Amino acid sequence: MDPKRFTRRLVALGAAMFLCALVFVVTLFDAQIVNGDDYLAQSIRTNAKSETVKASRGVITDRNGKVLVSNRAVYTLNFDSSLVSSDELNDALLRVIDLMNAQGVEIKDTLPLARTSPYAYDTANGSAKTLVKYLVSLKWINEKNVGDDGLPTTLTGSALYLKLRSEYGIDKTLPNSTVRTLIGLRYSLASAKMNGSTTFEFASDVDVSLISLIKDGNYAGVQVDTSSVRVYETDYAAHVLGYTGSIQDWDDYKDKDGYTLASTVGISGVENAFEDYLHGSDGKRLVTLNESGKITGELYSVEPKPGSTVALTIDIDFQAQVEEALKNTVSSMTKSDGIDRGAAVAVVQVGTGDVLALASYPTYFLSTFRQDLAELSTDPLQPMWNRATQGKYAPGSTLKPLTAIAALESGATTVREKIYDSGKWTYPGYSASYTYCWKRSGHGSLNVRGAIMNSCNYFIAEMGYRMGMDTLREYYAKFGLGAPTGIEIGDTAGRLPSQNEGENLAPWAAFGQANQEYSPLQLANYIATLCGGGDRYATHLLKNVRSSGSGALEYVYDAEPVETIAMSSENLSAVLAGMHDLATDGAVSQYFKDCIVDAAAKTGTIQTGDTKNNNGAFVCFAPYDDPQIAVAIVIEKGGSGAALASTAVQVLNAYFSNTSASSAITGENTLLG
């Protein structure tokens, strides 16, 4: 070969190789230096996924630090439809159904339809609001086609079942039970998509053996995650603690920062009231995925911040004793007369408004209430209703101490004035308008102290007549009646007394009639205000909030009076002495002789039109010479208030026998009913 020709070829080959190398270097430079960030972002978008790492909810304790609600780490199973083609979606979900059925694992179902034919609507399964929103989006109904129960009126449950089966392209030859489960899963996916997500949770708290089967079986779209579930460390205080649920049923949370469609939120009780403290801050992680959607690596993460620890004002040991005493009293009454009844107790600390115990009967168990929900929802006594805060009852004679102090302070009477009780009080100028004292023969000559001790209707009716309705309402309102008490879980405002057309009902309002109604908590707080010298505090359940990590205090409740009612010491002493006389020498003294603390009390019999079904009410405070706690009890169809006295003594003794156990309890007392 010609050497020159060979040299030229060699030069040409070298030049070509140089050009190839140059192109490679330029491309590499562009990929890594010039446009490196863009290429990396594109790679991440293609092969990685951002995931939320749920923060565990904060722990709830009682006033002494005893844990009431905590968390337990669990495995959850999610389905991500973005990892499965639409043609393969039903088949992928059917594989999941077969696996869950084989392992005996319950699949979460948020579709508010019964699981079996004829597929009637059943809101115990899911939210009616979410269903209606979905059906409106499909143009199957409009928002006008919704009944008072929040469910469609123009589409039956069975018709919806058939339409959804068709909408989701489900094989008609499948067993009905399988079709219903598959419809539920597809509906859960549709609900998630309405809120901008492709992922939904279909099983929680699953066993590790199932996790192994999931990983080994290559179940398309299925992802394993970790979460936490609430653990209830007590069987008591269910109405106070409340429960959590899915955010999808609660629109109030959906637009708040820090929440996702998978979030668990507080629905009732302190779980709801202190959501901002308990929720915590979710973390974030970016994970790489293979073609099947399995996580192959983690690119970065932001650690979740658990919710804060919330300490309540209640003493759980005392709460348990109050609930047991109330249950025993009601059970004994029911055993005797066969009448089912509800009841409630509220115990408030004088001078702070701390709620030390709230008992509502019947109650329920937070650890099993979801399984018991159908039974609880149909129970005529409504076990999930918090009678202590939401119950509205005529106060009866428990209101007489307040009427008495109003009469003294307004100048309607004095501590020295005596009025003769003949047994029948007649409205001046109207002989047809009258009321009898419970003692038909009358009490004879009484002052205000004696009137309270003897629960004299004659004396109190005269005070109501002298003051008039406006003055009564003014004083009742000062003591917090007719308005919420401030408790964070919410309570009824109750109702102040009112007039009927053409009548002056002030004499009857004075001893607890005339259309007025209050909750047991309102009655307890009025007594706390009275025996506390006129300082009225908002009732509350929050004691403090601490960081879940360091334990550092983040918030401490600072009790300040919301109102101070001026009362002369002479007037107040006379009223409180009348209550003390009742407990020591009056109608309930036989019960209070066994009380380990000196107490003062007032009974109340609330007429319901049937003397056999009169409600019983009872209020107390103790110790008499240094009031620490106030208590109110109401037992529906409980008869006279005196019948509640023995229960009150049980609770007082339980409370004071525990005062030496902890400095946090010392100086607090209670009463029950």
PLM region descriptions:
Residues 1-276, 282-303, 336, 343:
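Membrane-proximal periplasmic segments of bacterial cell-envelope enzymes
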Residues 57, 73, 218, 325-352, ...:
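Flexible, solvent-exposed loop/hinge segments and secondary-structure transition points
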Residues 69, 75, 289-302, 314, ...:
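Beta-lactam-recognizing serine transpeptidase/beta-lactamase-like catalytic domain environment
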Residues 82-83, 635-639:
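A generic structural motif
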Residues 90-98, 208, 212, 216, ...:
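Solvent-exposed, polar/charged alpha-helical surfaces in well-ordered, non-transmembrane soluble domains
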Residues 252, 279-282, 293, 323-327, ...:
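Amphipathic, well-packed alpha-helical segments that form the structural scaffold of globular domains
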Residues 295-343:
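Conserved, well-ordered alpha-helix/loop/beta-strand core segments that scaffold catalytic motifs
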Residues 531, 583, 649-660:
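Short amphipathic alpha-helical signal-transduction/dimerization elements
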